[in-house]
């Protein structure tokens, strides 16, 4: 079941929370709405569900306008962060609930309900807990019950509002993998809200990054990481180093050093330079690719790589976070050399395009 979000606007009083949002979600795709608090992601999810009404715009399911349909008529499954299970019902009865309250002409008979719930219990790996009550379950088990209950009525679309936000880190990882496997098996269309970048990129087919009621970027997870469309996405998606400098003529100046850009940009003046830790060239020896001296302040082994915090020596005041691969991890106090040639330049929110899309930073002049 495809979803078309067309020119959705939403205001609460004088506060505009969604600004002309448009997005197409193909049938069978799992989409993450990712953003900080106040970005509008949960409001958009609730509008898709019919739990909130847009100020203007349209929601279409597979070409049919459902904008004025009540939530119960949209055939949407909704999973909340805090489970919303019935405390007085067993696991089995919680999952069966949606089936038992269907209109009589749509309601399966008791045998069919039992068969479906039994199948769902096996699918969510909770068959052995069918007679337990919510108070006897862990957080991860409760969330599986909530998901099974949402799937019991065979929704055309599954919506999840920060489904793993209340769980500890290890349980979140396990449930993310499980949800992805379940999606691959059932091929339902799904939209989930999260503020966790790792969760969004691990589970979703497409990540929609939102900020202040706008869509900043909607792309495949690796594309959002590698080619952020805006400065907001660049800074929001994981750790990034920011250095302040200036473009003068055909050179980029940062601290006491400058490099030729290989051309003269139209913009001249202050700029911010951004590199993710793994985009910083780093070496134990000075070279054209890594000419700038730094000293290791912290070294944190991460398995196949070491994350370092390094202090520039004489050319910039703020420390940088970098990644160094290999088994021979640097020690605190060791002298290394870095290069910044894969940086992105911004003047405020405006990207400064560079030749070949990267800085041609050469050996310091």
UniProtKB/Swiss-Prot annotation:
Entry keyword annotation includes Transport: yes
Ranges for domain ABC transporter come to: 3-237
InterPro entries assigned: AAA+_ATPase, ABC_SmlMolc_Importer, ABC_transporter-like_ATP-bd, ABC_transporter-like_CS, Mo/tungstate-bd_C_term_dom, P-loop_NTPase, Sulph_transpt1
Enzyme class name: translocase
Q: Which reactions fall under this protein's catalytic activity?
A: sulfate(out) + ATP + H2O = sulfate(in) + ADP + phosphate + H(+); thiosulfate(out) + ATP + H2O = thiosulfate(in) + ADP + phosphate + H(+)
Further facts: CysPTWAM system can also transport molybdate.
Protein function: Part of the ABC transporter complex CysAWTP involved in sulfate/thiosulfate import. Responsible for energy coupling to the transport system.
- Put simply, this protein is called Sulfate/thiosulfate import ATP-binding protein CysA
């Amino acid at each position: 079941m495809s979803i078309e979000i067309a020119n959705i606007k939403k205001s609460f009083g004088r506060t505009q929370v969604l600004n002309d949002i448009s997005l197409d979600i193909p049938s069978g795709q799992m989409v993450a709405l990712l953003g900080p608090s106040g970005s509008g992601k949960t409001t958009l999810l609730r509008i898709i569900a019919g739990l909130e009404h847009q100020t203007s715009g349209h929601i279409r399911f597979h070409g049919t306008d459902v904008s004025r349909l009540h939530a119960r008529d949209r055939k949407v499954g909704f999973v909340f962060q805090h489970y919303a299970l019935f405390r007085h019902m067993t696991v089995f009865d919680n999952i069966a609930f949606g089936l038992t309250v269907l209109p009589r002409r749509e309601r399966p008979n008791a045998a069919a309900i039992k068969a479906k719930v039994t199948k769902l219990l096996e699918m969510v790996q909770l068959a052995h807990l069918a007679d337990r009550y919510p108070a006897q379950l862990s957080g991860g088990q409760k969330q599986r019950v909530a998901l099974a209950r949402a799937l019991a009525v065979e929704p055309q679309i599954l919506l999840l509002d920060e489904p793993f936000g209340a769980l500890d880190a290890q349980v979140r990882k396990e449930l993310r993998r499980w949800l992805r496997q379940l999606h691959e098996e059932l091929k339902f269309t799904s939209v989930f809200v999260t503020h966790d970048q790792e969760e969004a990129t691990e589970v979703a087919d497409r990540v929609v990054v939102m900020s202040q009621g706008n869509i900043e970027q909607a792309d495949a997870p690796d594309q959002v990481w590698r080619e952020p469309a805006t400065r907001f996405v660049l800074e929001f998606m994981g750790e990034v180093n920011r250095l302040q400098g200036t473009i003068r003529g055909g050179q980029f100046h940062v601290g006491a050093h400058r490099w030729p850009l290989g051309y003269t940009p139209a913009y001249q003046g202050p700029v911010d330079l951004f590199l993710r830790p793994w985009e910083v060239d780093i070496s134990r020896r000075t070279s054209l690719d890594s000419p700038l001296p730094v000293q290791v302040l912290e070294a944190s082994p991460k398995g196949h790589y070491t994350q370092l915090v390094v202090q520039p020596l004489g050319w910039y005041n703020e420390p940088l976070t970098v990644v160094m691969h290999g088994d021979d991890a640097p020690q605190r106090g060791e002298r290394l050399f870095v290069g910044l040639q894969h940086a992105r330049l911004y003047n405020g929110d405006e990207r400064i395009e560079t030749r070949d899309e990267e800085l041609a930073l050469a050996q310091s002049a």
